[in-house]
Design a protein with these regions (language model features):
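Membrane-embedded alpha-helices and immediately adjacent juxtamembrane helical segments
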Residues: 1-295
């Protein structure tokens, strides 16, 4: 009994309490539901990405007075026996993408808004379940909250996606200095980590019906961002080392698909586990406040 009452005094006790709370709140089941919603949201998101590629290609064709064939010659300087066939396939696919960009947009926008708002609605329900709070906001307010998080997330993701382009453009300007280049790359990594932490912090602060203390939300956001970055880099390492485009149905590519599904589930589980971390940190803060009050 005394050991259970003093769980907050040792790191092992905190970890044990967090895992027990995860089991009590059915975190594995909730993570499966969130993974399914995330995969559904990814489908119209890919459609919108293809539409964006079509608009970008059309913009290049219009501004530079080129056709698709000439544009591909600049982008894909292929050589070898198979280059002609690959070039024809790429030209046909890109031409079809340019023609279908309008239809892809009309299809992708409503589906993306629907499934992404459904995803954040699921996150809202899961957060309320973990934090033991009922949804006391009216339904229109709750749905507007979900949609606002959709646009905030899209804005942060686009800003984060622009970092590799900024890194590539500024690589030549930095020169050959190792220390300067390393510091610049490290600063970009910190900015990317800051984007992830900021996104998770906003999710913890906006979506639940019960407002968390900002310090508790920040601890959970950092935990979730660390788990996301570690999982992303491990998966990218596997893709770089083993995945090949020569044979789509190779064993390595099939394993990559399985690992992607596992990665999605792992990220959903880590997100919900970070909610439990927030709850445990809040309990520790209350225990310490009670000890100070009684002392």
């Amino acid at each position: 009994m005394n050991r259970d009452a003093g769980w907050h005094r040792t790191p092992l006790g905190v970890i044990r309490r967090t895992l027990e709370a995860a089991v009590e709140d059915n975190i594995p089941f909730l993570a499966s539901a969130l993974s399914f919603d995330l995969l559904l949201t990814a489908l119209p998101f890919v459609v919108l990405l293809l539409a964006a590629v079509g608009y970008l290609v059309q913009h290049q064709i219009t501004t530079r007075q080129l056709d698709v064939h000439e544009l591909l010659e600049r982008l894909l300087p292929l050589s070898g026996s198979d280059s002609a066939d690959m070039f024809r396939h790429a030209e046909a696919a890109l031409s079809a993408l340019v023609r279908a960009r309008g239809r892809l947009t009309l299809l992708g926008v409503p589906l993306f808004l629907w499934f992404s708002s459904r995803l954040f609605g699921g996150l809202r329900v899961a957060l309320n379940e973990v934090f033991d709070s009922d949804e006391n906001r009216p339904w229109p307010v709750a749905k507007l909250t979900d949609l606002s998080m959709v646009f905030i997330t899209a804005l942060l993701l686009f800003a984060n996606a622009g970092l590799p382009a900024l890194k590539a453009q500024s690589a030549a300007a930095l020169g050959d200095g190792f220390l300067v280049a390393w510091l610049y790359r490290f600063s970009l990594e910190l900015v990317a980590f800051g984007f992830s932490t900021g996104l998770f912090f906003l999710i913890f602060e906006i979506l639940p019906s019960r407002r968390l203390p900002w310090r508790t939300a920040l601890v959970s956001a950092v935990f979730c961002a660390l788990a996301f970055e570690v999982g992303k880099r491990l998966y990218a390492l596997y893709l770089a080392r083993f995945v090949t485009l020569d044979r789509v149905a190779s064993d390595a590519n099939l394993v990559a698909l399985f690992l992607f599904l596992l990665w999605v589930y792992g990220m959903a589980y880590a997100f919900l586990l970070s909610c439990e971390v927030a709850e445990v940190v809040d309990l520790i803060r209350l225990r310490r406040a009670q000890r100070v009050g009684l002392g």
